[in-house]
A protein has these predicted regions:
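PLP-dependent aminotransferase class I/II
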Residues: 1-177
């Protein structure tokens, strides 16, 4: 790390992680409480309507997504997902993953790989402090599902004002990768 900035050094030490979500220590997601309370109280009136719209968006998205390429059989009972979840089926080539990301980038569609935050938390640097680090072989065999999600899944924002034509555009792009 002598010639690089600390951020670049950490990024190069962990090429398998999204550089925007490398956690050097476990953290708490702290937010200011008063302003969030005011905003939250003002939005409670819309909660049921917003939850229904998110459920409808997600169900519609899954109904149009190619189930030969992507996992679409989620248990959606009681969910109100903030994201449209995209997971390539097991056996997908790394090139297919890269093509999905290039396509999303090319069309300025914001996404995050690995679903929440930094993907497989066992790959995060802070894990070493607890003696929980795993070898590549252990990750691939003992945590195969987590590794698949880490490497072959994304989420795109799902919000109450998301229009069907935007969902259709996203689905058409994904289905034609």
């Amino acid at each position: 790390c002598k010639r690089e900035s600390f951020k670049d050094c950490v990024k190069h030490a962990h090429p398998d992680l999204n550089p925007d979500f490398i956690f050097l220590s476990p953290a708490y997601n702290m937010r200011s409480s008063e302003i969030n309370a005011v905003l939250g109280l003002s939005q409670i009136k819309k909660l049921d309507k917003n939850n229904k719209k998110r459920r409808d968006n997600f169900d519609y998205f899954l109904s149009k997504l190619d189930n030969n390429k992507y996992i679409t059989d989620f248990n959606n009972a009681g969910q109100s997902n903030y994201a449209l979840i995209i997971i390539l089926k097991p056996g997908a080539a790394i090139e297919q993953r890269d093509n999905v990301e290039k396509l999303l980038d090319r069309h300025s569609i914001e996404f995050r790989r690995g679903l929440s935050g930094g993907g497989n938390q066992l790959r995060q640097p802070y894990i070493e402090k607890y003696g929980l680090e795993k070898t590549e072989d252990q990750l691939k065999t003992d945590f195969a599902n987590v590794e698949h999600v880490h490497n072959y899944s994304w989420y795109v924002g799902n919000y109450p004002t998301l229009e069907r034509d935007k969902i259709d555009t996203l689905v058409n792009l994904l289905n034609n990768v």
